A protein has these predicted regions:
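Outer membrane beta-barrel transmembrane domains
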Residues: 208-309
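Residue-level signature of outer-membrane beta-barrel architecture
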Residues: 72-76, 120-124, 178-186, 226-230, ...
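Residue-level detector of the transmembrane beta-barrel scaffold of outer-membrane proteins
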Residues: 41-43, 80-86, 131-135, 190-194, ...
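Short glycine/proline- and aromatic-enriched beta-strand/turn motifs that initiate or cap beta-hairpins
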Residues: 20-102
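Outer-membrane pore/translocation modules
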Residues: 23-26, 77-223, 248-252, 256-264
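Generic detector of solvent-exposed, compositionally biased contiguous segments
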Residues: 49-69, 110-112, 260-274
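Bacterial N-terminal signal peptides that target proteins for export
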Residues: 1-5
Length: 309
């Protein structure tokens, strides 16, 4: 890990007063690594409130969050074996980030995260169509930071480069999730109810300058989806359903700290096309969704596409 925030502190100390230099946190590098791991943990944790392939754009105040995720899970055999995978890209841009590193000075950081997470679990039936699914997860990712400190580029005073001082961090995560869900039919309505608790612990890979930095992703997800057949609407001559969904993600610990919010809620609508008549192997339906996003510090939207197997 290149000492992103430590470089920032050094640059500021070289260009401002000795009093300001004394306010620099000497553990800035470890703090930067923990911040980077916290941001990466959000991207690497599967979010069931969004579609399998989704684009999210949210902003508020001095923060912006953009992410793309490709997520899916299925049972390859007739038994309870369940496999899950996620590939995600996220860009998070807060201002006044970890202000204790340089007291009274704004730090504008753009964190770009790429993550891949896999999961292996087993599905057990409960009662009344409810099922429980414990899953073990392994994740790999990289987060890169570009920063602007006190309205000027993070550039050493004697450097001939015109690039921002930036840095990257490779990390791995390991953890587990427990999901409880139900799929049922109520009259013409098909409904899904899902509860999921996910915990992943992230640590840097071969980054001695990161010190003892680590971060955890601890998220609780509540989600529901309702489908209603549109008998008089056919797209591409295929049966169509109206889809309504809503969910909330509750963030705990490091995830809540780095996002500065304890929750993120979504609600949306869309159309689902029955694809069983097309001959596509294993695919039962395709779904297009538009969701609104709201949180304490954010608001925005998400566009997603999903498949039902």
């Amino acid at each position: 890990l290149r000492r992103i925030l430590a470089f920032a502190a050094l640059s500021a100390a070289n260009t401002t007063s000795p009093t300001f230099a004394q306010s620099i946190n000497p553990d800035a590098s470890e703090a930067a690594a923990q911040a980077a791991l916290s941001v990466l943990s959000i991207a690497a944790t599967p979010n069931e409130t969004l579609s399998s392939f989704s684009f999210l754009d949210a902003s508020g105040g001095t923060k912006s969050l953009r992410s793309t995720q490709l997520r899916g899970g299925y049972k390859p055999f007739e038994n309870g074996l369940y496999l899950e995978g996620l590939v995600a890209y996220q860009k998070y841009n807060p201002v006044i980030f970890f202000p204790g590193i340089a007291t009274g000075t704004e730090l504008d950081v753009t964190w770009s995260s790429v993550a891949a997470t896999v999961g292996v679990g087993w599905e057990f039936p409960l009662i009344n169509e409810w099922k429980i699914r414990p899953v073990g997860h392994l994740s790999l990712g990289q987060v890169t930071a570009d920063a602007i400190f006190a309205d000027f580029r993070l550039l050493g005073p004697r450097s001939n480069s015109n690039e921002l001082i930036d840095g990257n961090l490779n990390a791995f995560g390991i953890g587990a999730s427990l999901g409880i869900f139900r799929e049922a039919q109520f009259g013409p309505w098909q409904v899904e109810y899902r509860f999921r608790q996910t915990f992943l612990e992230f640590n840097p890979i071969n980054e001695p300058q990161a010190g003892n930095a680590s971060a955890s992703s601890n998220q609780t997800t509540l989600f529901s989806r309702h489908r209603y057949p549109l008998d008089n609407v056919r797209l591409f001559e295929l049966p169509t359903q109206l889809v309504l969904d809503a969910g909330v993600v509750l963030y705990h610990g490091d995830s809540a700290t780095v996002l500065d919010t304890d929750w993120l809620a979504t609600a949306g609508f869309g159309l689902e096309i029955d694809t069983r008549l097309t001959g596509l192997p294993a695919v039962r339906a395709g779904r297009l969704m538009l969701n609104g996003i709201v949180a304490e510090e954010f608001s925005g939207f998400s566009i997603g596409f999903g498949l039902r197997f």
